[in-house]
C-alpha cells in the first residue's frame, strides 16, 4: 500500500516538474520559493485555508469577486495549456510508435536477406573446395604446359622479328620497330653463339642500321618539328647511339630556332608587345627545348646525365645573354613617361615568364639575371622621372617669368604674385603626387617582382625617397639659388619679383611642404631598408637657407635700383649753382612710388612683421640737422676763426653714440624687414653720393627739402623710424659739411614746399 502511494507521489512530482519546465521555472528559483509565505498561490507551501481566511479578512466583496474571476481565468488558461501540452506529446508518441513499427519490419526483412546471403556463401565455399581438390592433381602439369607455351611464343616472335621490323619500317612505324628490337636485343645477344639465333641477330642489326641512318637524316632536317626531333633522339638512344653526339646535334638544331626568334625581336614595337613576342617565342621554345632535352638525356646512366645537364646550361647561358641584351636595349629606348603601367606590366610579364626556365635549369640563372634587368629598368625610370620633375619645374618657372613680364589688366596688378605662387606650388605638388603614383606601380601587390628584397627595401628608401624626392627638392633649391647670380652675368637679368616669389616658395617648403611630401612618400613606400636617409630637418634647413639667400638678393637688387636713381640724380646736377628750391625733385617722388610699389608687392607674399612704437606724429618730425638754428650754430663755426672746436670732431663724437646701422644684413621673412633693408641700401647710397659732391646754399636747401619729403613717406615702411631719421640726418649733415655757404632753409618753408609737392 505504501509502495503504491509512493509511486503516485513520484508521478505527481514528475508531472509537476514537467509543468514547471514548460512554464520556464528553473532550479534557481527553488531556493527563493522555500521562503515564500503559505498564502502565495504559486508557492510550494501554499495553504488554501490560510489563503481564504486572509482573503476574507482583507478584501471586500467586490475584490473577492475580482479575485474569483481572475482565478477562474487563470484556471481556464492553465487547463487549455495543459490540454495543448498533452495533445502535442500524444502526437509525438504516435509518431514514435509508427517509426518503431516500421524499423521492426525493416529489420525483419534484413534478417531474411542475411540468412540468404549466409546460405549462398556456404554453397560457394563448398564449390571452391571441390574445385581445388579436383585440380590439385593436374596443377603442376598445367603450369609446365603454360611455361612451354610462353617459350614457344617468344621463339616464334624471335624467328618472325626480321620480317616484323621490315614491315614496321615500310609502314613508317619506326617507334614500333625500335620497341620490338629493344625487347629481343638482350635475348639475341645472350644466344648469339647458336647458329639460328646468330642469323636472326645479323639480319636485325642490318635492318636497324638502315633505320638509324633514316632517323639521323630526319634529325638533321631543319624543317623537323621539336616533337619529331624528340622522337628521333629517343629512338636513336634506344638504338644505343652515342649520347654526347646526340646532345650536341640536338642543341645545334635548337640553336638555329632560338636564334631566329632573337632576330625577329630586332624589330621595334610596343614594349609590352616586345616582351610578349620574346616570351612567347624565345622563352617558350627554350623551355620546350630544355624539357625535351632533359627528358631524353637526364636518364642516361653514369656521368652522361651530368655531362648533358652541363651542356644544356652552357647552351642556354650563351643564347639567353643575347636575349637579355636585346631586352635591356629595348628598355633603354622606353623614354615615354605617359603611362608607366605599360612598362611595369611588361617587366612583370617578363619576370613571370622567366620562372619556368629557372626551375627547369637552375644553373643558368634566368631568374637572377631577369631580376637584375628589372632593377636596372626601375632605377632608370626613377632617373627619368627625376629629370621630368626638373624639366617640369623649369617649365613652370618659364611660365611664371612670362606671366610676370606680360602686361596686366587694370585692377589685377595686386593679385598676380599670390596667384602665381599658389599656381606654381600646386602644380609642382600635383606633379610630385602623379610621379609617386606612377612609381608606386613597381611595388603593387599584383606585381611578381615586388616581393624581391630590392623593391621592399632599397627601392623605397634609396630609390624613391632619396633618389627621386630628396634629389628633386635639392634641385629646386639649387635652381632657385642660380637666380641669385649677378644680373646680366648670363646675358639675362632675373626679375626681382621672381626672386621674391621663389623665396616665399622655399619658405613654404621649409615650413610645411617638405614634411608633407616626405610623409606622403614614407606612407606610400614602407620600405624595410635600414640604410640612412636624409632627415627632414636637413632639407628644411636647405630650403630656409635658399629662401634667405633669395630674399637677401631681392632686397639688394631693389635697393640698388632705387640707389641707381638717387646716384644719378646727385651726380648729374650742379649743386653749387642750382636755383633756390621751390618743389621736391621728381626723382624723390619716383623713389617713394617705387618703394610703395615694392611694399604692395611684398605684402602679397609676406606678413606685415613687427614695428617699434612710432611717435605721435612721425611725418612731422624735425631732425636736429633740419633745424636752421642748429645748422647755423653747428656749421657756422667752421667759418669763424675763433671757433672753440672743430665741427667735424663734433659730428664724429655724435656718431660714436649713435646706433650702428648694418646696411647689408640678412633680412627677416616679413614685409617690414624687407622694406627696411631696401630703404637702408637706398639711403646709404644717397649719403655716399652726397659726400662726394660740393653744394652751394640752394643745393643744401634742396637736399633739406628732398630729405624731409622722404621722411614724410618712408618712415611708415621701416621697423624703426629712427633708422630713417638717422640716415637722412647724416645726408643733410654731409651736405652741410660739403656746402660752401651753409645757409639752411627754415623748417616751416620746407614743410610748405613738401606739402605742396
Swiss-Prot record:
SUPFAM superfamilies: Cullin repeat-like (SSF74788). It is found in: Golgi apparatus, trans-Golgi network; Recycling endosome. Component of the Golgi-associated retrograde protein (GARP) complex Component of the endosome-associated retrograde protein (EARP) complex. This is Vacuolar protein sorting-associated protein 51 homolog. Residues 94-124, 371-392 form a coiled coil. It comes from Xenopus laevis. The lineage of its organism: Eukaryota, Metazoa, Chordata, Craniata, Vertebrata. Keywords: Coiled coil, Endosome, Golgi apparatus, Lipid transport, Protein transport, Transport. Transmembrane segments: none annotated. Disulfide bonds: none annotated. It comes from the Eukaryota. GO terms for biological process: endocytic recycling; Golgi organization; Golgi vesicle transport; lipid transport; lysosomal transport; protein transport; retrograde transport, endosome to Golgi. GO terms for cellular component: cytosol; EARP complex; GARP complex; membrane; recycling endosome.
